[in-house]
């Protein structure tokens, strides 16, 4: 509350003016979210990696993937950090050449979710502006290897040294057919031909910060198949499967439910998505299928998949031109996919998302994070009306065609939350989330959000740092 003191020689009056909920910083608001048994849900932020832990100016934290890298039974995190604090990697500038900087980091997990061992496995010209990573056992030695998509140049394969994964240098190969050929934004591993060895699938958007000339040129989504030693450039074969204006996704998912992995592609320039149907067999045969959407446009950068309406078909969930929504797969192949609104976090820009049953009611909910615009290293010129760094979740209404309830968690002046991964990290029976945080130096890095359940409402968000980019209220 605000206290205003008014006094005269005869009278002293204290006037109490309540602070409106609209002016309360989001993270400080008492949570209204509850579990299925009536307990209140709030969140505690924990730091896994940041500039202090790294010992250098770690920034531009972007994609992350999870797997047991050292085979000790605990999940580890591979994260990429774009080092783009001094320039806006989302804005075209033909007169500026970004420096070839960036880091690929691993946080090795333990039995305690607050104890991690962090190392760098690639940096600089090996990993210039890394955007995404994928993990799979490519060489068949039982240890997951890493592929990284870098926006300033290429794909790089990093081979796990096995028992020495925490201490030894990781052998590497820049895939020769990708070097200097564009800007790689997404990469995935999948065994498309069921031969027991994964292929890499990547989208080349042509330029890190595409301008009009880049949008006018179609660049490929490609499959990279390896036969032989993956550290030998001659062992890799590239097959382009389609060309698009700024393709920004190439995700393997069995979208048609026939038991093999298809590939979803997304085009920023064309504002559309499509998929390549895997025709099966011992050779990779793919046929492109349109995804015609009624009610919204989708560019397909970040999407998740679930049978939202319970009809036995996977639906697509993601940011659209109308807000966060889900797109219902039709019963008949070739028919239109229909858009259904979940909600918006306007004026903030939704980018990262994950699905999980957050409130333990048996239904899938959706966690979403935004992409803050404006300065990345300073808070002073940012106000509540801009696109800020928000985290929120949407509660499933059971009837998914109805309104989803939005529960805001945090809204800081700066923060990009590009990806979330659901995990019960503290093994207490509720869902927590891993994430990266960018656009907010010196607070970038890797975090986890612990779900807290209490009998009485608490502040929605407990920050890990005393000093951070300030929490902001919602816009009226």
Locations of the language-model features?
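Bacterial N-terminal signal peptides that target proteins for export
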Residues: 1-7
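Bacterial N-terminal signal peptides
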Residues: 7-17
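Beta-propeller-forming repeat regions
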Residues: 22-476
């Amino acid at each position: 509350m605000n206290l205003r003191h008014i006094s005269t020689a005869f009278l002293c009056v204290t006037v109490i003016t309540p602070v409106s909920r609209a002016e309360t910083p989001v993270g400080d608001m008492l949570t209204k979210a509850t579990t299925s048994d009536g307990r209140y849900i709030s969140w505690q932020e924990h730091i896994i990696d940041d500039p202090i832990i790294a010992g250098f100016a770690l920034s531009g934290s972007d994609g992350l993937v999870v797997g047991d890298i050292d085979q000790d039974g605990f999940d580890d995190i591979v994260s990429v950090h774009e080092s783009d604090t001094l320039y806006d990697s989302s804005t075209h500038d033909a007169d500026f050449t970004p420096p070839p900087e960036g880091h690929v980091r691993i946080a090795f997990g333990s039995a305690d979710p607050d104890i991690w061992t962090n190392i760098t496995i690639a940096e600089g010209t090996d990993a210039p502006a890394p955007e995404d990573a994928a993990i799979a056992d490519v060489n068949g030695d039982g240890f997951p290897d890493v592929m990284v998509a870098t926006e300033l140049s290429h794909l790089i394969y990093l081979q796990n040294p096995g028992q020495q994964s925490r201490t030894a240098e990781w052998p590497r190969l820049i895939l020769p057919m990708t070097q200097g050929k564009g800007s790689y934004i997404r990469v995935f591993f999948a065994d498309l031909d069921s031969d027991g060895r994964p292929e890499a699938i990547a989208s080349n958007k042509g330029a890190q910060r595409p301008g009009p000339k880049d949008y006018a040129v179609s660049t490929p989504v490609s499959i990279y198949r390896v036969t032989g030693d993956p550290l030998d450039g001659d062992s890799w074969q590239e097959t382009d499967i389609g060309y698009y204006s700024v393709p920004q996704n190439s995700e393997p998912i069995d979208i048609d439910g026939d038991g093999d992995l298809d590939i979803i592609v997304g085009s920023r320039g064309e504002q559309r998505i499509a998929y390549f149907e895997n025709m099966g067999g011992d050779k990779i045969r793919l046929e492109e299928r349109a995804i015609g959407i009624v009610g919204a446009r989708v560019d397909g950068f970040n999407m998740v998949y679930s049978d939202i309406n319970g009809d036995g078909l996977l639906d697509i969930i993601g940011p659209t031109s109308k807000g966060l929504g889900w797109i219902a797969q039709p019963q008949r192949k070739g028919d239109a996919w229909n858009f259904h609104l979940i909600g918006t976090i306007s004026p903030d820009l939704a980018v990262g998302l994950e699905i999980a049953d957050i409130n333990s009611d048996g239904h899938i909910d959706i966690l979403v994070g935004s992409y803050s615009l404006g300065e990345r290293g300073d808070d002073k010129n940012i106000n509540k009306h801009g696109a800020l760094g928000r985290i929120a979740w949407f509660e499933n209404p059971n009837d998914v065609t109805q309104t989803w309830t939005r529960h805001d968690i945090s809204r800081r002046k700066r923060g990009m939350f590009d990806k979330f991964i659901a995990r019960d990290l503290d093994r207490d029976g509720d869902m927590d989330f891993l994430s990266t945080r960018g656009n907010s130096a010196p607070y970038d890095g890797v975090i986890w959000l612990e779900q807290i359940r209490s009998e009485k409402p608490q502040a929605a968000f407990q920050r890990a740092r005393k000093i951070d980019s300030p929490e902001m209220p919602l816009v009226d």
